[in-house]
């Protein structure tokens, strides 16, 4: 039987490449995207490669789309095996802390933190029926000279704590779901205006890291994995 995965923000970038690589391994792809035209176009591209895929409308800024997607998947794809929380927004990556507007910070938090929280909470009951996995794309906690976008780090890094807390809750209450985070490294995408450099990796390389962890059959519950060489695990 084909295993099924839901990937948010999967119409482009590392999300789409992850969908393609998992599809090549025989997974059925539920492609989460806000925009119907772009989502269906991405599905068509996958189908042309022989991959079974379906567009699912998910906008992390709109809780109703999350709940509607969960209701649909619970009835039509109740054997969902994995959720990849990939979607996120970066805001102005060059703005200093004193230049960031509160409205922008709230907008990013709505997607990067609250939206991902609602995805985890809403889809856990479906995944628990299938001993499923929740993989969250995340970033390093500490800014450095190479990577220090204030709004993005401030709204994305709390996800790491949330992963650990959900993992602890799942283990304590014997909920058969694994939740973990993956930091695939610096990936050249439109999120960073296609930044390049010796520390940056292609979407193909980044997706390989994600696929490897998702399918490795090791228990990563509550852990954050950083793509160095090999993966480093933060407990």
Segments from the language model and where they lie:
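Canonical Rossmann dinucleotide-binding motif of NAD(H)/NADP(H)-dependent dehydrogenases/reductases
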Residues: 1-30
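Conserved glycine-rich Rossmann-like NAD(P)H-binding loop of the short-chain dehydrogenase/reductase
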Residues: 25-41
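The beta1-alpha1 cofactor-binding region of Rossmann-like NAD(H)/NADP(H)-dependent oxidoreductases
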Residues: 36, 57-69
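A glycine-rich helix->loop->beta "capping" turn
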Residues: 51, 72-83, 91
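Catalytic loop of short-chain dehydrogenase/reductase
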Residues: 89, 96-109, 117, 128-172
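C-terminal helical subdomain
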Residues: 177, 181-182, 189, 193-235
